[in-house]
């Protein structure tokens, strides 16, 4: 069959990798590179070159089994990294890094701060109580994180300086949106990733040489069928197949795989079905401004508080997530220069220290979106169309691979 695949992120490339075995595929990519959120940038400092990841960075040995199996098939090497999380609040001056006891009290005054100790106690209480509530079915499907925190009487320091900014950093969502986040979804993710345990946590990893190292081997078997700078403009379907309108004109296909974002897929459909409107319309995305730079002022004031992920508080709770990734820690970069990737903080960065600007869209989760996710199978096959993407689950690389495998199963293909 002739199959059009729209999008070349992890979902699109995995779909193409599998479907290319027996079918005639064409991958349409609007950008001038393939990989989607996997975008490694080469920079040079003091005569040395470094490959810095600006989108997809980390994965772990607990919750990425299919992605790791794919890397194994491709012969792509990876190495362990350190995952740690810090919060800094310019208003109160509070900052900490949860990596160790020493870094937790990087700001030594926290040792004698009752509010800080209340936060620590509530971290331990939340980790214990929320798992017990989940296991004993005491979390209603309609309950949000904010409702649970209020009902449980958790202190404001725990809410505002720990659990909500951590969620905002993970899903690139505003603090307000995190308060409205579906609690069951939140707790299952935190439990599965060891985030509700002090000691029992997965080993996080990065791909050696940068995340983009898997792109060439993954696409090698079909690279001649990839069209860069070729955005799809409209998709029409009829009883016999699919018409794809792109900058190349009109082309006819038997099937189409939408491996782009949910909102993009819905916008491309000339005549979306009621199910497509309802399901895809509930799966929202939001843009995040991303800057690669060397301005360490966006990290905590005390170097001991520098973590892999660093959340900066301040401003209204509705503003987009403000997180900075310390790439030297994450990628094990040996350099006197500290490379940072910051979300939604462009105005605070010294312009002369900016190495690159990018924009990535991330799924925005809600009670409606979780309900829509459960209906994925309804959009696999009808009208010769298949939809895949990380938005069908937690929004990460493993989820993109799993969604592509669901599509591939309909064509009798598997990893």
Task: Please describe what each predicted stretch is.
Residues 2-27:
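N-terminal Rossmann-like FAD-binding beta1-loop-alpha1 element of flavoenzymes
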Residues 11, 33, 263:
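Conserved Rossmann-like nucleotide-cofactor binding loop
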Residues 20-44:
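Glycine-rich FAD pyrophosphate-binding loop
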Residues 41-67:
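N-terminal glycine-rich dinucleotide-binding loop that anchors FAD/FMN and/or NAD(P) in oxidoreductases
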Residues 42, 99-100, 318-415:
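Conserved flavin/dinucleotide-binding core of flavoenzymes
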Residues 61-180:
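Mobile amphipathic helical/loop "lid" adjacent to a hydrophobic cofactor/ligand pocket
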Residues 188-246:
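Helical element adjacent to the flavin cofactor pocket in flavoenzyme catalytic cores
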Residues 231-361:
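Mid-domain catalytic core of redox enzymes
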